[in-house]
Amino acid sequence: MKFFKRYNIDQKTLDEFKKYYVLLHGPFPNDMYDFEEETNTSLDEFYEFFALITGSLNYIIEDKKIPRYQREMLKKTFYEHYPHFRNYKSDILKYQELSECLEFHEKIRILINKLITGG
């Protein structure tokens, strides 16, 4: 059953997305700040990517159209958006909370893409 006019989701999927949205609004991983300090990098890109995913999920929950530029951004992984972080991939894995948070955002990004592309 189509629940929304803009997205082909049912109540169960909507409830699941709402749970994800709540989880995405939790605090940032504690070890993010350790990563920043120990690698001498900025966390700005993480904040930006996390906001992209959370904001896009909110558009879906509110049955609003995700802007075209944002849909285009959702096609890319974190490492495609910020290629300089590819050099830190193995370092990121050492920070369990950060790694899990990034992985969760990627999972949601993929779900959003499937929904908006009909795939």
Swiss-Prot record:
It comes from Bacillus subtilis subsp. natto (strain BEST195). InterPro entries: WapI/YxiJ-like. The gene is wapI. Pfam families: YxiJ (PF14176). This is Immunity protein WapI. Immunity protein component of a toxin-immunity protein module, which functions as a cellular contact-dependent growth inhibition (CDI) system. Neutralizes the tRNase activity of cognate toxin WapA upon expression in E.coli. Does not inhibit WapA from other strains of B.subtilis. The WapA C-terminus cannot be expressed on its own in E.coli, however it can be cloned in the presence of its cognate immunity protein gene. Cell contact is probably necessary for growth inhibition.
